[in-house]
């Protein structure tokens, strides 16, 4: 349980005065992890400069760096870590030039995060909760006994402050590491979705089930011990109610209660969020594997799965009936209200007679397309016919050609619902919009 006794300006001035800074590129961080690993294998926890150089040599080889300047670069790295308070250097007058190095609390904290805290262990968590339960019970018994201020400080406040609070912080850190692991699993699933769908399903299910199981183990362990922990905290709180001079204990107990409630609450909320994510991934991946033909939907789904926690989503699909282009074959070819008066050349001729003559000729000529099963492009055919007639007859001839053509068959492209391109059919700006007739 962190408690700051200094204000923000004081902390800023202190950090500036001491020139605190941390800069750890990947090679330097790897060197620090190597030092921590080798240091953990030693009983005395001390390392000589030669051992640090050997560790640096391993890191340098792994990064394929030159070995010619290994001594200079190792010395620079060691001095840099001493300056950043990651290593402590101890020199002796008896062994001049042969310094001893030990990891600082900062160095241990960084390496502990990357090495030890990355692995979740139900047994480790159970042991931590067992220790907390024992400390809280002893503190509660001491609070019930009562005593002077020294008694409260030594037997109640100190165990709560320096044992219970630190273990609560460790459990909170475990939860935050699990949050990072959830994000890593999401990234792994996104990478799997870039591969073959059917091969990805089993891998995704394995990742999802492992994460769900780990979260459930963590929460079950917390809930099993949570009631006892809260009960002992309440015992301590009740004991302080009759003492006006124990505000520091009461405030600490309140902070611990809030921390424990927050840990248990976030554990359950994290499980609920993951269950929702798990359910959606299973449902939509199995649906999408049959729907995805051109990999377009896969790309959108990968992005949606990746950002699910930020933007939750649901899939709704509909199967609408096809839209058919229904033509009235008996529709009158010409409407006086639309076309206006007859051209002068046709003023003294009966329109129906001309229509029948042209229709018979055009029908005979267009029948060749049906006989040969050749696609009929109305744009090209109408343009060829209009080139044979004067401009005054273009409108009527075009209507006749189109009318006869649509009697022969239909265009399969009409069923796609996509509009056809406009094609010019004469030199005066007239255009027609029609798909190629390919089904007779």
Curated annotation (Swiss-Prot):
The keyword Cell inner membrane does not apply. CDD domains: MukF_C, MukF_N. One of its GO terms (biological process) is chromosome condensation. It comes from the Bacteria. The keyword Isomerase does not apply. Pfam families: KicB, MukF_C, MukF_M. One of its GO terms (cellular component) is cytoplasm. InterPro entries: Chromosome_partition_MukF, MukF_C, MukF_C_sf, MukF_M, MukF_M_sp, MukF_WHTH, WH-like_DNA-bd_sf, WH_DNA-bd_sf. It is found in: Cytoplasm, Nucleoid. Keywords: Calcium, Cell cycle, Cell division, Chromosome partition, Cytoplasm, DNA condensation. Belongs to the MukF family. Involved in chromosome condensation, segregation and cell cycle progression. May participate in facilitating chromosome segregation by condensation DNA from both sides of a centrally located replisome during cell division. Not required for mini-F plasmid partitioning. Probably acts via its interaction with MukB and MukE. Overexpression results in anucleate cells. It has a calcium binding activity. Interacts, and probably forms a ternary complex, with MukE and MukB via its C-terminal region. The complex formation is stimulated by calcium or magnesium. It is required for an interaction between MukE and MukB. This is Chromosome partition protein MukF. It comes from Salmonella typhimurium (strain LT2 / SGSC1412 / ATCC 700720). The gene is mukF.
């Amino acid at each position: 349980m962190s408690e700051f006794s200094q204000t923000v300006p004081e902390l800023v001035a202190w950090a500036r005065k001491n020139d605190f800074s941390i800069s750890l590129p990947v090679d330097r961080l790897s060197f620090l992890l190597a030092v921590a690993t080798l240091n953990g294998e030693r009983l005395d926890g001390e390392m000589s400069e030669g051992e640090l150089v050997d560790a640096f040599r391993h890191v340098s080889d792994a990064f394929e760096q030159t070995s010619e300047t290994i001594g200079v670069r190792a010395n620079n790295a060691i001095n840099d870590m001493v300056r950043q308070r990651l290593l402590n250097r101890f020199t002796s007058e008896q062994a001049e030039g042969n310094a001893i190095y030990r990891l600082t609390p900062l160095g241990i904290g960084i390496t502990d995060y990357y090495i030890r805290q990355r692995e979740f262990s139900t047994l480790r968590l159970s042991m931590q909760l067992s220790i907390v339960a024992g400390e809280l019970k002893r503190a509660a018994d001491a609070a019930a006994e009562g005593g002077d201020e020294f008694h409260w400080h030594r037997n109640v406040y100190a165990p709560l402050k320096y044992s219970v609070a630190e273990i609560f912080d460790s459990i909170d850190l475990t939860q935050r590491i699990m949050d990072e692991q959830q994000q890593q699993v999401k990234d792994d699933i996104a990478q799997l979705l870039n591969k073959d769908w059917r091969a990805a399903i089993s891998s995704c299910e394995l990742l999802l089930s492992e994460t769900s199981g780990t979260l459930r183990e963590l929460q079950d362990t917390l809930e099993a011990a949570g009631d006892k922990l809260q009960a002992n905290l309440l015992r301590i709180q009740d004991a302080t109610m009759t003492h006006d001079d124990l505000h520091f204990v009461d405030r600490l107990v309140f902070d611990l209660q809030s921390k424990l409630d927050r840990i248990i609450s976030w554990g359950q909320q994290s499980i609920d969020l993951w269950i929702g994510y798990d359910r959606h991934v299973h449902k939509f991946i199995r649906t999408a594997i049959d729907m995805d033909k051109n990999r377009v939907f896969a790309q959108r789904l990968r992005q949606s799965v990746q950002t699910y926690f930020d933007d939750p989503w649901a899939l709704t699909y509909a199967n609408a009936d096809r839209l058919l282009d229904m033509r009235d074959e008996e529709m009158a070819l010409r409407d006086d209200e639309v076309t206006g008066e007859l051209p002068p050349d046709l003023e003294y001729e009966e329109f129906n007679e001309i229509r029948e003559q042209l229709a018979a000729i055009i029908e005979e000529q267009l029948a060749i397309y049906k006989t040969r099963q050749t696609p009929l492009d109305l744009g090209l055919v109408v343009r060829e016919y209009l080139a044979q007639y004067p401009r005054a007859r273009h409108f009527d001839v075009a209507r006749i050609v189109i009318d006869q053509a649509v009697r022969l068959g239909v265009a399969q492209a009409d069923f796609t619902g996509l509009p056809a391109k406009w094609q010019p059919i004469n030199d005066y700006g007239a255009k027609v919009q029609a798909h190629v007739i390919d089904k007779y």
